[in-house]
């Protein structure tokens, strides 16, 4: 468990000399990227980098942000300000610690005071979800996720397997917004409102993962059946709106 008081903040100026090549997943190919991918990737060190997408209208950040993750050991995260005609205005490199392992859920946030991180081992998948540590009061629950076409039921497949992603079969809570355009999946360590990891997407789009967006306030979630994470673990709190990142991939060592 990594408490917020123990969160690590890391300084700028991580090495970025080596150019790398990355084959983008369909998810990222379908997204409009104001920042040229090769320009961003040229600033990373390792050959196992993966693209993380974050676009936010958070007034505290006052920018649109796209992040690139670079990690066989630890993380190299680049933050770009794209608010001026989609040009690269500023860049901050943050070095996160090397203790992160595979199959961990990691909460990561960019802030004015620097990045912080918390982690929790998750037994069911190797995907990593990034989201800011806002507070959330949400009852933990569990559901099986099966079908992406019917957002009005309890069976929702948030990940299209044909795109190379494994379905999340043990997400702790599921809710659909009132207009059923957005779906929220949150993972929680217990019933104590003490942890949540969420990603949002537009379920009305022809490609569910094409647009990552903030969600409306959710409807009542489904009741928990069985816990899927160690109840002794904790993740940072987050709110059901804000900037969120969906990030896929097993780390290559």
Curated annotation (Swiss-Prot):
As for subcellular location, the record says:
Cytoplasm; Cytoplasm, Cytoskeleton, Microtubule organizing center, Spindle pole body; Chromosome, Centromere
Major localization listed first in the record, in broad terms? cytoplasm
Keywords assigned by UniProt?
A: Cell cycle, Cell division, Centromere, Chromosome, Cytoplasm, Cytoskeleton, Mitosis
Question: What processes does the entry annotate via GO biological process terms?
Answer: cell division; mitotic sister chromatid segregation
GO cellular component terms, semicolon-separated: CENP-A recruiting complex; chromosome, centromeric core domain; cytosol; nucleoplasm; spindle pole body
Cell division among keywords: yes
Region Disordered: start-end pairs: 113-136
Subunit comment for this entry? Component of the CENP-A recruiting complex composed of at least mis16, mis19, mis19 and mis20.
User: What does the UniProt function comment say about this protein?
Assistant: Component of the CENP-A recruiting complex that ensures the integrity of mitotic spindles through maintenance of kinetochore factors mis6/CENP-I and cnp1/CENP-A. Seems dispensable for proper chromosome segregation.
Protein name, please? Answer: CENP-A recruiting complex protein mis20
Q: What species is this protein from?
A: Schizosaccharomyces pombe (strain 972 / ATCC 24843)
Taxonomically, what lineage is the organism? Eukaryota, Fungi, Dikarya, Ascomycota, Taphrinomycotina
